[in-house]
């Protein structure tokens, strides 16, 4: 991407980027605070609350680092040194990977938790939190190793124009790598994401089947004049399906924008669009969780009630 194009990107795009960061940080902060309060207030906290709190914290840190990077894209005068560039971009890449991993593993835990007693997944209910924690630590180590090449390929932007590097922000540039190294890292990332997305798809298919089963039971109950009010499990299943669908749509859209950007060396507008799309899930998903969980609505209702009374 050309530096001049980066500097003169549409003002509306800058505003949208900063707005997304601000809204996402606020939403994830709210989600994190609520689940920390739930964890501290329960004698036997549920693992699902711990994982949601961790996911919201990961997304919060991701959006904060993204905000710093976006600020350096549009507002800085290129004051970061190589160590700052390497550290921030490495942390951002690591947090993006951990967000993907945490989202997929959270959906696995949700699927196991909501599975009926007759399901073959029942035997994993008590063991799943430990197994998922181990899987997350494994992926964490894997992501750290996958992103380690950034310490060699990210440099402070030099005061010259060259085809050997690509501008990331005003302060930071990415050195071009050899074809073999690029292929190796691309293949490793593709395998990692294919595995997690496949896991995501399996959970989605299972949840669709589970939701259909609930609906069929509701129809049978309705035909016998028994209340067919949605159960907490059904509401949770719909929430998970909504988040899964949104995640998959954004993932496909992000890859489409990325491949389009690769065809245009100076596609600064596409670069901004990719940033917006790739962080949309971290911004929107907390609102879905906040608005669909009754405990969270009651929590914020009581908090605002206390503020008004004061």
Curated annotation (Swiss-Prot):
Got any disulfides in this one, which pairs? 85-172
Where it sits in the cell: the answer is: Cell membrane
Q: Quote the gene name from the UniProt entry.
A: Vmn1r41
Ranges per topology, Cytoplasmic? 42-49, 115-134, 212-238, 291-310
Residues glycosylated per entry: 159
Listed name of the protein: Vomeronasal type-1 receptor 41
The family database entries (InterPro entries) matched by this protein are listed as:
GPCR_Rhodpsn_7TM, Vmron_rcpt_1
Extracellular topological domain ranges are 1-20, 71-93, 156-190, 260-269
Give TM regions: 21-41, 50-70, 94-114, 135-155, 191-211, 239-259, 270-290
GO molecular function terms listed in the Swiss-Prot or TrEMBL record: pheromone receptor activity
UniProt keywords (A-Z) are: Cell membrane, Disulfide bond, G-protein coupled receptor, Glycoprotein, Membrane, Pheromone response, Receptor, Transducer, Transmembrane, Transmembrane helix
Principal subcellular localisation of the protein: membrane
- Biological process, per Gene Ontology: response to pheromone; sensory perception of chemical stimulus
Query: Which Pfam families does the entry mention?
Result: V1R
**To which protein family does this belong?**
Belongs to the G-protein coupled receptor 1 family.
> Null mutant: what phenotype?
Mice lacking all but one V1ra and V1rb gene (12% of the V1r repertoire) show a lack of chemosensory response to a subset of known pheromonal ligands and changes in maternal aggression as well as male reproductive behavior.
List the membrane topology term(s). Answer: Multi-pass membrane protein
Q: What job does this protein perform?
A: Putative pheromone receptor implicated in the regulation of social and reproductive behavior.
Q: Does the keyword Glycoprotein apply?
A: yes
Keyword Disulfide bond annotated: yes
A single Gene Ontology CC term: plasma membrane
């Amino acid at each position: 991407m050309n530096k001049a194009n980066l500097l003169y990107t549409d003002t509306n795009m800058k505003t949208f980027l900063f707005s997304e960061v601000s809204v996402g940080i606020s939403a994830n902060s709210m989600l994190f605070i609520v689940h920390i309060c739930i964890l501290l207030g329960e004698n036997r906290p549920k693992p699902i609350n711990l994982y949601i709190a961790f996911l919201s914290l990961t997304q919060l840190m991701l959006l904060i680092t993204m905000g710093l990077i976006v600020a350096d894209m549009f507002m800085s005068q290129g004051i970061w040194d190589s160590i700052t560039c390497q550290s921030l971009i490495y942390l951002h890449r690591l947090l993006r990977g951990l967000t993907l991993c945490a989202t997929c593993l959270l959906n696995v835990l949700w699927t196991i938790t909501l599975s009926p007693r007759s399901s073959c997944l029942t035997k994993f209910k008590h063991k799943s939190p430990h197994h998922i924690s181990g899987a997350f630590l494994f992926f964490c180590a894997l992501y750290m190793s996958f992103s380690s090449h950034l310490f060699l390929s990210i440099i402070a932007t030099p005061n010259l124009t060259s085809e050997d590097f690509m501008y990331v922000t005003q302060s930071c540039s990415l050195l071009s790598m050899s074809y073999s190294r690029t292929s190796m890292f691309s293949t490793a990332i593709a395998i990692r994401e294919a595995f997690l997305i496949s896991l995501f798809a399996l959970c989605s298919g299972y949840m669709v089947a589970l939701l259909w089963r609930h609906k069929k039971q509701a129809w049978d109950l309705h035909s016998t004049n028994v209340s067919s009010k949605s159960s907490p499990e059904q509401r949770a299943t719909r929430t998970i399906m909504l988040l899964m669908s949104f995640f998959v749509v954004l993932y496909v859209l992000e890859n489409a924008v990325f491949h389009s950007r690769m065809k245009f060396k100076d596609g600064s507008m596409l670069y901004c669009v990719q940033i917006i799309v790739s962080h949309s899930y971290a911004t929107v998903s907390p609102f879905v969780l906040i608005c669909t969980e009754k405990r969270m609505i009651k929590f914020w209702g009581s908090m605002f009630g206390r503020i008004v009374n004061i």
